[in-house]
Amino acid sequence: ILDYPEYSLDMFFEGVPMLRSFLLAPVSGNHDSLYAVRRRLPMAGQDARTGNYWFVRAGVLFIGVQIGDRYFPNHTDFMASVAESAPEHNWTVLLIHYGLRSNGVHGHDAPVIGFRDTLEPMMDALGVDLVISGHDHEYNRTALLGGDAPETDTASILYAQPGERIYITLPSGTGLKYYDDSRSADFPFTAEGLEHEPGYVFFDFSPEEISLSAYSAATGEEIDAVTLRRGAPITEEE
């Protein structure tokens, strides 16, 4: 969060020894005024105009969208180029700071809606399975959205059809800032929590499924868990 005092950056670098063991895929937030100065992303899939990027790891296509460029046709062009260039993969994940489908306080902000209206048709074309966001400093997860998905589905295993995806809003990882509770979305959610406490989310990818588990950082309690698969559920008769 780089337009805040320099000590906030110092806090991040305190974790560098541990962070060296992780693959980091940062995307710019609404306070990242020096994002390009502080972060170097040496990837062949990086777009010179927007700073957007993509890469494939372990069969997963990750697409990072930077919110600093609000000339939306640039993002449309970038997504089209990813569709043409990305190699074969099992799953597609979009990373963006704004919660495109969030039940938090910023869910109806104009920039959020602008990115949502721009990116969702391209997500359909790319077959995006999972959208991971932040910005609202609380955890929430949508039902499967798009296609013929039911309005609510609280099952622990979800079966996505073409055009369907899950949206995840990550909680605050540090507890430095929270918003008052806001429930203003007009689309369905199946999990919410961690409005005023830090948390974290684990994701596990295999060729057959994506599994995620969300936890309270204070207590270690699991507050949400779901597995995403493709196609129709297998019945006992099958």
Predicted regions and their residues:
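A short C-terminal boundary segment appended to hydrolase-like catalytic domains
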Residues: 178-238
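Residue-level recognition of alpha-helix boundary/capping or hinge positions
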Residues: 55-59, 104-106, 207, 238
